[in-house]
């Protein structure tokens, strides 16, 4: 969405005759030969290059990110020195376009409720949910089942959302095998400049502010897939997988499906649907 907004801002730039569009993103731009590269912001705790991975190199050539070389505290200090009224405003931590609204309440206004069962990996019913759209893979808080009689006290995590049965599958323990994936299939791949050749080494980030992991990107007959150097938790279809080499953001894609032999075998035994894109 942010990349599309930057593109829209470029249209405004063209219509007004401005030379550049400056935005408040914590990211940087550097020249590399004939290309303009998108770089991580120097303040790693605020870096927003993840959200800009769909911006084109052409648009980057006409963009300015003045905050990219600064820390948040430096920005606040500049604001205080210039008596700006928002100099001490609290950081926003939610989804910017819904304001102070509760996320679930906001979604329910558009999608309503679609109740279903919460089950464990063996199909035992543990409770009920009001809609799969209110949960994400790897989620621990807010599942709504609490302690389960006769079970260990370990935390429950969302491992699978089955659209056909409308079941939310949860497992116990952050180290449960069903939470981990060895890679993922990608859709709607976008390269900011030149694409990487197949089998290239890179780092991939699967959510905002998550630690990037070493990986290899591979081109298949149906698109791209990524193999991680080690299994990682909560790889979520629909989220963005953003590709880096060092500080440079090369582009990214939508996660189409996770790659996990444990998950595939379990899903097949349980009769749940999954896709393999090779």
Give the ranges of each region predicted by the language model.
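Single conserved hydrophobic/aromatic residue that forms the stacking wall/gate
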Residues: 1-12
């Amino acid at each position: 969405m942010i990349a599309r907004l930057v593109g829209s801002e470029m249209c405004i730039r063209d219509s007004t005759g401005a030379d550049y569009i400056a935005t408040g993103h914590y990211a940087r731009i550097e020249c590399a030969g004939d290309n303009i590269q998108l770089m991580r912001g120097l303040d790693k705790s605020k870096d927003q290059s993840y959200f800009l991975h769909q911006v084109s190199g052409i648009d980057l050539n006409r963009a300015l990110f003045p905050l990219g070389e600064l820390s948040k505290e430096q920005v606040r200090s500049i604001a205080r020195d210039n008596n700006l009224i928002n100099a001490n405003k609290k950081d926003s931590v939610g989804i910017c376009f819904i304001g102070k609204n509760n996320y679930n309440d906001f979604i329910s206004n558009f999608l309503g409720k679609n109740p279903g069962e919460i089950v464990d990996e063996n199909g035992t019913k543990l409770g009920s949910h009001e809609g799969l759209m209110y949960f994400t893979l790897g989620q621990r808080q807010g599942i709504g089942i609490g302690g389960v009689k006769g079970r260990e006290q370990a935390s429950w995590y969302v491992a699978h959302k089955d659209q056909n049965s409308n079941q939310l599958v949860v497992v116990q323990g952050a180290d449960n095998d069903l939470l981990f994936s060895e890679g993922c299939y990608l859709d709607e791949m976008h390269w900011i400049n030149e694409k990487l050749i197949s089998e290239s080494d890179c780092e991939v980030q699967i959510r905002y502010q998550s630690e990037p992991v070493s990986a290899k990107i591979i081109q298949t007959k149906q698109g791209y897939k990524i193999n991680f150097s080690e299994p990682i938790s909560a790889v979520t279809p629909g989220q963005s997988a953003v590709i880096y080499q060092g500080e440079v953001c090369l582009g990214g894609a939508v996660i189409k499906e996770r790659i996990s032999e444990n998950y595939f075998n379990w899903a097949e035994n349980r009769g749940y649907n999954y896709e393999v894109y090779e």
